Amino acid sequence: SLGFKIMPLYIKDMSRDKIIAASTDGMMMSGRSPFIMQGWADMEKQEIEDIEKVLKSKGIKSELEVDIGLVPEIVTDRMKSCDILLIGKNEAITERIVSILKGNYKSIIFIGEKPLKRMEKVIIANDDGVKINRSCYQFTNLFPEVKEFTSFVINKEIEENHLIGYLEGKEKTITHEVLNTTDYNEVLKKIDEYDFFIMGNLSRSYFFEKIIGKNGIKLLEKSKTPIFIG
């Protein structure tokens, strides 16, 4: 109903094959690896069957493609033919997701607890930086039908917000506010009232930002609302 043509893709991750036990003298102990590999093969088969059932139940007629290789490399190659990468999101940024974020050159939508059903209420994390500006540029080109946005910044007055002016120049209606709070549960609660959340891409030092508790990591990991990063 949102007008997407979906290309479902399942990747059998070759990096799993690198997991193998080693003895104390450095000799490789591969005796148990066939059992491990068979267990993974059975799990992958079941996952593929489960995904195919879900696709069918959702009315998605596109055939699930199965590829084998390193996940970031395959994603990078497949995105040459696509506009947006759609990824399921847990409450943690894994190393695999970080690799995809670093290498991806197209827009990304993260889907967490809350499904993407409509785009009537869209909210922007607006610090007037270049990354959120780029995300909004990509979003408005991909979804020109969205005309109204809510914009917020946390504990920061911006005298001249260029992003607001940019969006208004594209005939968009913007409602902007400053959230004066140090409680990120309040911010998340507000975001989760919306259908879609636009944020800028994070810096390349994802895990360092996670350790020191940077705002973007918190919002990316904890938000239930679907997230768009351009």
How should these model regions be labeled?
Residues V66, L70, E91-A92, K114, ...:
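Short beta->alpha linker loops
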Residues S1-G31, G103, R118-L179, K190, ...:
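Small/aliphatic-rich secondary-structure junction motif
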Residues E44, I48, I97, S135-C136, ...:
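Short, highly selective alpha-helical patches that border small-molecule cofactor pockets
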Residues E49-K58, T94-E95, I158-L167:
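Short, charged N-terminal beta->alpha structural module
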Residues P72-E73, T94, I132-N133, E160, ...:
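Short, well-ordered alpha-helical microsegments
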Residues D77-V146, K222-G230:
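Intrinsically disordered or low-complexity boundary/linker segments at protein termini
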